[in-house]
Every structure is written in structure tokens, then in C-alpha cells.
Amino acid sequence: MKLEEIKKFVAELRGLSQEELAKKENELKKELFDLRFQAAAGQLDQTARLNEVKKQIARIKTVQSEIK
């Protein structure tokens, strides 16, 4: 993700409620699980997507802690 995309993503997150953030986090965790499974099976083409999803989850957790 480019810096502009990251800023847009974080701004979007800040507009969400706690429940919506939790839902988005769960979706990304499921995607991360699927990506890890594909990587273990040797079927993953976009290996950079793993790190991107991890960082998005961390951004969500950061916004959640800001709200609290």
C-alpha cells in the first residue's frame, strides 16, 4: 500500500464504530488464515499480501485503542 492509500484506510477506520472495527478485524484475520494456508500449500502467488494484511490488522487495533 502506498502512503496515500494507508492514510485513506486509517481515515475510513476512524469513522467506524467499535462493532464495525471488530467485524473488519475478524474478516482480515480470516483472510490471513486463508493466506497462511495457501502459503503452506505452496499455492500463494502474492506473498506480500501476508504482510499487508498483518499491518491492516495492526492499524485496526491501533484505532480501537485510540477510541477507548
Swiss-Prot record:
Pfam families: Ribosomal_L29. Gene3D superfamilies: 1.10.287.310. CDD domains: Ribosomal_L29_HIP. It comes from the Bacteria. One of its GO terms (biological process) is translation. Keywords: Ribonucleoprotein, Ribosomal protein. HAMAP family: Ribosomal_uL29. This is Large ribosomal subunit protein uL29. It comes from Streptococcus thermophilus (strain ATCC BAA-250 / LMG 18311).
